[in-house]
């Protein structure tokens, strides 16, 4: 499938309805519109929206929480019609560039072992498996793989 170059912007209130709909499509325990709105006020959070450059519609989004020198990717989601076109990778690249530029020690994320596409994408950006949270997800019940990319040496190079 052809790669799609999206416009990545900070999430704002205008995106919340579409992102809440995306959450419902992608996750068994979706974040609500109100939960997403709270993140707009969170000084430790960075949420990005991927927009179709032709239509301006939301095609994906991702969230990052920063605590001290640690980054936690909370969400990465892309509408099914836009998957396998590089959208999630573009979002992940922005967060990796941010982590390196801000001298974060690492970025980490959790993913279902059954989500082979997300695991492959994360590995392509240098994430490696560091652990497993047993029975972390439900609907269906599944472990979470903990994938981490270290930036300590990169940031100090």
Task: Give the predicted meaning of each segment.
Residues 92, 115-118, 135-140:
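Short glycine/proline-centered loop/turn elements that form peptide/ligand docking sites
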Residues 122, 127, 147:
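Conserved active-site tyrosine of GNAT-family acetyltransferases
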Residues 79, 83, 112-114, 139:
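Residue-level recognition of the GNAT/N-acetyltransferase active site
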Residues 108-110, 128-144:
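Conserved catalytic-core motifs of GNAT/GCN5-like acyltransferases
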Residues 3-4, 10-83, 92-98, 102, ...:
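Acetyl-CoA-dependent GNAT
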């Amino acid at each position: 499938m052809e790669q799609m170059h999206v416009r990545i912007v900070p999430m704002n209130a205008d995106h919340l309805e579409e992102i809440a709909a995306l959450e419902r499509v992608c996750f068994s325990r979706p974040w609500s519109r109100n939960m997403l709105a709270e993140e707009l006020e969170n000084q430790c959070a960075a949420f990005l929206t991927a927009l179709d450059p032709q239509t301006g519609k939301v095609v994906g989004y991702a969230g990052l929480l920063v605590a001290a020198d640690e980054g936690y990717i909370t969400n990465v989601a892309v509408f099914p019609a836009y998957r396998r076109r590089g959208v999630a990778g573009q979002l992940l690249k922005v967060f990796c560039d941010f982590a390196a530029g801000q001298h974060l020690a690492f970025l980490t994320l959790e993913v279902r072992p059954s989500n082979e596409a997300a695991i492959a994408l994360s590995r392509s950006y240098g994430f490696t498996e560091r652990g497993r949270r047993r029975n972390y997800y439900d609907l269906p019940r599944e472990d979470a793989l903990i994938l981490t990319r270290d930036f300590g040496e990169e940031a100090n190079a």
